Amino acid sequence: MRINHNISALKACNILGKTGGALDKSLERLSSGFRINRAADDAAGLAISEKMKTQIAGLEQASRNAADGISVIQTAEGALDEVEAMLQRMRELSVQAANGVNTDEDRAAIQDEIDQLNEEINRVSTTTEFNTKKLLNGTVDRRSYSDNEKIQLISLSDSVAITEYALSVTKAPQPAQVETTIPGSTSKSAALGYNGKIAINEKEIEIKETDTLNDVYEKLREAGSTVDINVTPTVEGADGEPETATIADATGLLFETTDKGDDASIEIYCTNEELAKALGISSGISGAGVDAEVTLDYTTGFARTATVSIDGDYVTVTDVDDFKMKFKVQGEAEATVTVLKAGPMDLQIGANEGQTMEVRIPKVDTDTLGTAVVNVNTQESAQKAITIFENAIQEVSAIRAKLGAYQNRLEHSINSLNISAENLTEALSRVEDVDMAKEMVTYTQQQVLSQSGNAMLAQANERPQSILSLLQS
């Protein structure tokens, strides 16, 4: 027996300290609900749980991003719904104007409403926005830049590659011409390159700069072929330069229409030849005239057919693979048009880098829809307007269908993200959360050990007192 060192008390105290530490940890876990409260509790488990927390937070934010994307799409689709309603109304007006019972005054009134609806379409295009971001003015579509302001790319199809295209207009499309034949003299051609009116039998016929050959022909046909006319035409002289002449004795003039003053010659080249070959769009697209069929040749044995359609200042190139570009051309010019990807709206619909969804909303206005120069002042032009508005309605419907597909995809993405977050949260719970029942068993065990340890420590401290009995004896 020793009195300098109470080994039993030291052992009991040491064990009691360990029991107290275990009891403290158990109390901490029970009060917090977490198995891991610090890195020392489970270093690997802590690292895993933190990565899971990061992923869960990213998935939840991605779900909110997708919901915001749906809001954007619904905003654009709502505006397009109204645009399509206006196009339907304009088509209805065109059908009305095509009826032969209408007078010129009736058609003029109809034209006024069409013009107002066109202006409203342009207003919707420039003002529709979400969170101050314009949606229908082309900023959410692929961007394009032209180094010549006389040639501007208005719209392009999805199959158009992101690269540079060289566009050459060797002859600008000319407006329709009218020819006046004066008895006993030579013929003179009057090129109507401006908005003007022709007075026939005290009745004014309006000819617009954008009127096609058929438009002019129909207006003159309805007025009669041989009429008394007073007109100041622009006459093309021998040197090809325009001259102004006034017809003094204008009775008995035969008023006829001729073909366009000049055919238009268009050439488009993709500067990336390998890309052009891979896409099958050929290295060049060229054509002349109205609705001219052209052949695209890249190499021997490779040939495709495309259509170059010219309507006033607008040139549309389309091939059999729906490679489609629409340009606005002002006179003879050459330009390099660069197509970029900078415009689309990329929605972050995943928790990690690169998990994005591209949303493209094409520019929607009267230029892209082709309704800017529509007129229904004659039966012929009204008939043509019906087709123009039908095509515009189909184009808007196609855009709305694409937006609907975007929305359906985003809704499924939200469901998928929510399920992923749910499953990952469940996995995190298994790693991080404490099993309360099991931990309560541990706590009870440590509590009993603590109480018994205190009792045994008291007993160990009393043992040295037994030495006094030896000294007393």
List each language-model region with its residue ranges.
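Primary detection of the long, small/polar-rich alpha-helical "axial" segments characteristic
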Residues: 1-473
